[in-house]
Amino acid sequence: MPLRGVLLLAHVLAGIAIAAAIFPWLAQRNRNRIIRAWSGWLLSICGVRLRTAGLPLPPAIAATGVEPGSRGRLLLANHVSWIDVFAIHAALPSRFVAKSEIRSWPLLGLLVTLVGTLYIERGRRHAVASTNRRVFDRLQCGETVAVFAEGTTTDGRSLLPFHSNLLAPALEAGAECWPVALRYSADGLRSTAAAFVGEMALATSLWNILTARRLQVEVAFLEPVPTTGDRGRHHVAVAAAERIADWLDVPPPRGRRFNGSANQGAGTADSAPDAAGATARPAP
């Protein structure tokens, strides 16, 4: 195991200890300050440089992701890797929506559970409705909630249609919907080193990242999609996907996933081939 691997293990264990011992006593804003700093350190340990663009928030709000008195904001992001979560956290700490299977991931599953991830329980008939209620409550508190709207990962060279199920609480709350584009590169060229796709094991993905050279992740906050008037969740999902595709310089998604079942909600979509021929995997 390279030195980075040892440091990463120690960092994750420290994060679990902090979240378990301290978080129950802290307000969400203070938790998020710790999450942001911890995530930035994780990226540094992994040798991943973070670059952000377009974040239109004052530093005090960007540091916590919480804006009391506001209607909150929903981030709709493309998805390449498990490390996407920490890249977004390092830029703007958010409460993520994820499939319940993430709980079983070694160490990382416990960590993301302790920091307040909202899970969708697969196999439950009313899973999406239950999650939507919790998302609505968090938005009403002025929090930032993040969703990987493709419901699965790609290698970053394509974009899949966005699910719209989890947009319902944002529209109901009157929250802003922000498209967020993530792109990995090395020496100025698009890189697939961070991609977590197909049947790849988490350990393999981790090794690829730790041994990559000059890996950079860009997190771009794009122009919010209007949610007023007669714009429904389907319209917002398509508009967000198109803005991300344009920024990534990839073709816009083909087809639609507007009527997916509960098991196709965020992080529970079935696998689909991406443009490069690799098989996407269900998302965190």
Question: For each predicted feature, which ranges?
Answer:
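Generic beta-sheet signal
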Residues: 71-77, 99, 120, 143-149, 180-182
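Soluble extracytoplasmic domains of inner/organellar membrane proteins
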Residues: 128, 134-136, 140-145, 151-167
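A transmembrane-helix-recognition feature enriched in membrane-embedded lipid enzymes
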Residues: 1-52, 110-115
